[in-house]
Amino acid sequence: MKHLTPANAKAKQFTEAAAEGRQDEVVAMNSMVGCTTSFDPGWEIDAFGDSMMVGAVPALKYYFPGIQIDARSNRHWSDGEAAVERAGDTLRRAVVLSFGTNAGIDEATVTAVLDRIGPDRMVVLVTIHIDEPRTRADNTLLRRVAKERANVEVADWDAAVRSRPDQLQPDGIHPSLDGAHLYASTIRAA
């Protein structure tokens, strides 16, 4: 078993507090070291996604303490539609949607999901990054749909990671540990 130095123990404590959404503890630890960075309140965010999001869960919890994440591998936009439907009126103020890696993006389904969420919540659509001909068309569709709605923004994961392929696992699709932070910060920047 690895022995923790006092500094490593504090870092571990901070990481666990952030991952578990203990916002007050994170803020207190930040202020003890003179850090004034504040994260968006994760308790106001629901996130739904596929394997891209699964790989980024710890980073998302770090950047958005308290975020509610519903992510599973091999999900499609139709699964996102069902998840949003199940959440119903309990959806939080902001919603992140990250689907399309496995089966492409169908405009009717994306529109149905956004209609269900409604115009009163902020929504972030995450672009896909895969080495397939459909990638450009799918991402163009997401950008176009977002432009048509005042409450929808795009987190351009494809552009962010295309310039940083070292942030991907060997499969060239899923984020590495460092890539998970790039994924989360791309969402945060949207």
Language model feature labels by segment:
Residues 1-46:
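N-terminal secretory targeting modules
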Residues 38-112, 130-137:
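Conserved SGNH/GDSL esterase-like catalytic core that processes O-acyl groups on lipids
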Residues 46-48, 124, 153-155:
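Hydrophobic/aromatic beta-strand patches that form the interior of the parallel beta-sheet core
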Residues 60, 117, 145-147:
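A generic structural signal for well-ordered alpha-helical segments
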Residues 93-116, 148-152, 174-186:
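A broadly tuned preference for mixed-charge, low-complexity surface segments
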Residues 119-122:
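A short helix->loop->beta-strand "cap" motif at the edges of active sites that frequently abuts
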Residues 135-190:
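Catalytic His-Asp segment of secreted/periplasmic serine-dependent ester chemistry enzymes
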